[in-house]
Structure formats: C-alpha cells, structure tokens
Amino acid sequence: MAIRNGEYLVITARDLGASLKHFRTMAGVTQTDAAEAMGIGQPYLSSLEGGRFGSSLTHALRLLRFVGCEVVVRPREPRG
C-alpha cells in the first residue's frame, strides 16, 4: 500500500482494509464503538479492516487499474 501526502493509494482490498483501520485509529475510535455506531458486529468490522470484502471488490479494483485509474482514500476537508 502506498501512502503519499497523507493519502492511501488503494490497489488491493487489503489496502482498503488497512486504510479503514488507519483512519479509524487516527480518529481514536475502537472497533467496538465503530461497529456499534454502524449497526454491524465487531467481528464483521474486523474482517473489513483485514481486507476481506469479497471477490466483487477485488475485481472492481483490478478493472480500475486495468483502465488506468486509481482509488485514493484521504481525509475529508473540514466542514465550515
């Protein structure tokens, strides 16, 4: 996973999971609290952070790279 200018370049589902974990941790939120706020179980959130999304996401990421695109995860701009 490449990090540039505070952004995560997502090449694989595992990269996306790592970015989820990174930004959740930076926000000071536990898996349990995040899962509860989202209405999902903590084990499911853990699997997402481990990059286990299913084959459709993997194929979508591969197609995006094939056609010359990239997926980047970055913090939102502050609202104000």
Whereabouts are the PLM-identified features?
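N-terminal flexible/basic segments that precede or flank functional cores
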Residues: 1-15, 50, 70, 75-80
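N-terminal first-folded block
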Residues: 13-25
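Residue-level signal for the short linker/turn that defines the boundary of a DNA-recognition helix
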Residues: 18, 28-29, 55
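Residue-level detection of the helix-turn-helix DNA-binding "recognition helix"
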Residues: 25, 39, 50-52
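Short alpha-helical DNA-recognition segment
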Residues: 29-44
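Base-recognition residues in the alpha-helical recognition helix of bacterial helix-turn-helix
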Residues: 42-47, 58
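Alpha-helical DNA-recognition elements
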Residues: 46-47, 51, 62
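DNA major-groove recognition helix of helix-turn-helix/homeodomain DNA-binding modules
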Residues: 58-74
